[in-house]
Amino acid sequence: MNHKILNKLEQLVHISPQLLRQPNTLRHAIQSTFDIELDEIEYSHMGELVDRIDDKVLDNYFRNHWQAEMKKYKYSGLKLIDEVNSLNPRRVLDIGCGYHEFKGKIDNLVGIDPYNDAADLRVKLLDHHPDEKYDATLALGSINFGSTDKVFAELEHAVSLCNTGAVMFFRVNPGLPHDESDRPVGKNHSNWIYFYPWDANFIVNCAEQLNVDILDIKTDSHRGRIYFVWRTK
């Protein structure tokens, strides 16, 4: 759950509890606060509403404002093209492929992304259930959002999509906000995104729990991101 959104939503209804009984007014307040569009307000509990808002915030940011910076990463950027191809993979999954920059460069690649039309499949990772498993995966900034239970569930599902011996490449965020210093005040579209605070201990503990080998962990060359590589058993 995105606690930044939850706390703001709680603040809104604490100040104006009538919003809980006025769905249209609540919808307008949410749209104005989070700069998103909601067709209707239907939820059984506050956590469900928070998840809907969070998904809309991510959709708005990655569809309309996010810019790729693949060339700026020493380890988790374009270097991966040769590294992945050297594995001779039968199938490769790019999780959260964005503009699908590796398409046509990495062999046998399938790109999934819920927010970008360039993807082969417009689907979230947890909703991706292919008929065949993968020999390699890329998750270069896509498993970065939400609480620990969500991040771990995505890691667990990614591992489940892999054949034995598959190599999994990751770039993760240690909890730093995206730099939008060039935008006017009030137009920082990543304000409401919760960036998960990855660290080496979490990576090691997850690897142990998911029964995968760690091949590499290092800090990449741009924005303090962490690059790591797993291999399934």
Which sequence ranges carry the predicted segments?
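Class I (Rossmann-like) S-adenosyl-L-methionine-dependent methyltransferase catalytic domain
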Residues: 2-128, 169-233
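Hydrophobic adenine-recognition pocket in adenosine-nucleotide-binding enzymes
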Residues: 142
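Alpha-helical scaffold elements within enzyme catalytic domains, especially in hydrolases
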Residues: 157-160, 205-206
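A conserved beta-strand element that flanks and buttresses the S-adenosyl-L-methionine
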Residues: 138
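Short glycine-dipeptide loop
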Residues: 162-168
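A short, conserved alpha-helix within the catalytic core of class I
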Residues: 145-157
